[in-house]
Structure formats: structure tokens, C-alpha cells
Design a protein with these regions (language model features):
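Short, small-residue-biased leader/transition segments that mark boundaries at the very start
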Residues: 1-3
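Alpha/beta-hydrolase-fold serine-hydrolase catalytic core, especially in secreted/extracellular enzymes
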Residues: 14-103
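Generic, well-ordered alpha-helical scaffold segments in large soluble proteins
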Residues: 5-12, 51
Length: 103
């Protein structure tokens, strides 16, 4: 699903109703399904369990990138249309130094 597909679904179903069960988290730099330079590894099941338990989609999902099996970067995955924005201090390889915000 891409952002334009999501917008079409939200418009057809009604934004408030659809947002209870649909969310899009983009993974910048990830290949088609995995790999690439992006932070492509995250616990999808835990994110869904959190959503069900809390009754709302996660505000962010922390994903990791590994090189030779070692985590070398973490980054928040943000619910569309938000994106991860660098706070301006700290390592750009650590998710804690980013915030999800509208572009």
C-alpha cells in the first residue's frame, strides 16, 4: 500500500472509522520487502498486539538496521503522514534522537 492508496481508503471509509483499523508506517530506504539501507527489522506482531491492547495504533515503531548481525542504527517508523525528524542533537543512528512529526 502506498500513501495515495491509504488516502483513497480513508476517504472511502471515512477517516475516523478507518483510522481505528488502518495505519501505514513507511520504512525509508528499505528494499521491496526487506533489506536495503533502511531500518528494515521490527517486531510487527508486538506492534499489532500493542494496538489491540491500547485500542490505538502505535505512535511510533522502533526499527533497526543490522550489519554483519550487529545493530548499527535504530530509527522510529512513524504513522503516515508523519515522518521521523531529527531533533538536532545526538547520533543520527539512534531512534531516541528523532521525533515523529508532520512534514
Amino acid at each position: 500500500m502506498c500513501s495515495s492508496d491509504l488516502e483513497a481508503v480513508l476517504n472511502a471509509a471515512g477517516t475516523s472509522a478507518a483510522e481505528k483499523s488502518i495505519a501505514l508506517y513507511m520504512v525509508p530506504g528499505m528494499g521491496h520487502c526487506q533489506g536495503g539501507a533502511g531500518t528494515d527489522t521490527f517486531d510487527k506482531v508486538a506492534a499489532i498486539e500493542q494496538w489491540v491492547a491500547a485500542g490505538r495504533a502505535p505512535a511510533q515503531i522502533v526499527a533497526v538496521h543490522r550489519t554483519a548481525g550487529k545493530i548499527d542504527r535504530t530509527r522510529p517508523l512513524c504513522p503516515y503522514p508523519e515522518v521521523a525528524k531529527y531533533k538536532g542533537t545526538g547520533s543520527t543512528d539512534e531512534a531516541a534522537n528523532f521525533v515523529c512529526a508532520k512534514p
